[in-house]
C-alpha cells in the first residue's frame, strides 16, 4: 500500500487547523487516517507545530512519502534533517508561555487602585458650571462692543 504523510484540514472557515496524518495515497483529503502523528495551527502567533518525531522517523523509514507542505513542516521541526542526515539547524522558535489570566486580572486591579482618581461631578453641577462660564463669556463680549 502506498502511504503518504499529509495534512488533514480541520476548523472553521478562515480558521484552519491541520493534523499531520499518515494515509493511503488514494484516500480523500479528510478521510480516515492510518495514524495521526502531529498537528499544525497556522493562525496562532507564532504558529503551533507539534509533531511526534519518533513516529515520523518510523513512517519515513518504512517508505511513506511526505507532501510538500509536510516536508516544509518537517524541515522547521528538524525531523527532515534527521531523516536525510543533513546537519543544518531547524528554524523552530519555542512558543512563549502564556501568562495566567488570574495573574493578569490581579495586576490590572492593583494598577487601577494605585492610579489617582479624578473628581466625578454630577450632571446638574456640570450643567450649572457650563451656564456660568457661558454667561461670563457673554458679559465680556458686551463690554468690548461698548468700548
From Swiss-Prot:
SUPFAM superfamilies: Ribosomal protein S16 (SSF54565). Keywords: Ribonucleoprotein, Ribosomal protein. GO terms for cellular component: cytoplasm; small ribosomal subunit. GO terms for molecular function: structural constituent of ribosome. Residues 126-140 have a biased composition (Low complexity). Residues 81-147 are annotated as: Disordered. Belongs to the bacterial ribosomal protein bS16 family. This is Small ribosomal subunit protein bS16. It comes from Cutibacterium acnes (strain DSM 16379 / KPA171202) (Propionibacterium acnes). The gene is rpsP.
Amino acid at each position: 500500500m502506498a502511504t503518504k504523510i499529509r495534512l488533514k484540514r480541520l476548523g472553521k472557515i478562515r480558521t484552519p487547523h491541520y493534523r499531520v496524518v499518515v494515509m493511503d495515497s488514494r484516500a480523500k483529503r479528510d478521510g480516515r487516517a492510518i495514524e495521526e502523528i502531529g498537528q499544525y495551527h497556522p493562525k496562532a502567533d507564532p504558529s503551533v507545530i507539534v509533531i511526534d518525531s519518533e513516529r515520523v522517523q518510523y513512517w519515513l523509514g518504512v517508505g511513506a512519502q511526505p507532501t510538500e507542505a509536510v516536508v516544509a513542516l518537517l524541515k522547521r521541526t528538524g525531523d527532515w534533517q534527521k531523516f536525510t542526515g543533513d546537519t543544518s539547524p531547524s528554524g523552530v522558535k519555542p512558543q512563549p508561555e502564556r501568562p495566567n489570566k488570574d495573574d493578569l486580572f490581579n495586576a490590572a486591579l492593583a494598577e487601577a487602585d494605585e492610579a489617582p482618581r479624578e473628581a466625578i461631578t454630577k450632571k446638574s453641577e456640570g450643567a450649572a458650571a457650563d451656564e456660568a462660564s457661558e454667561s461670563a463669556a457673554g458679559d465680556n463680549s458686551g463690554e468690548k462692543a461698548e468700548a
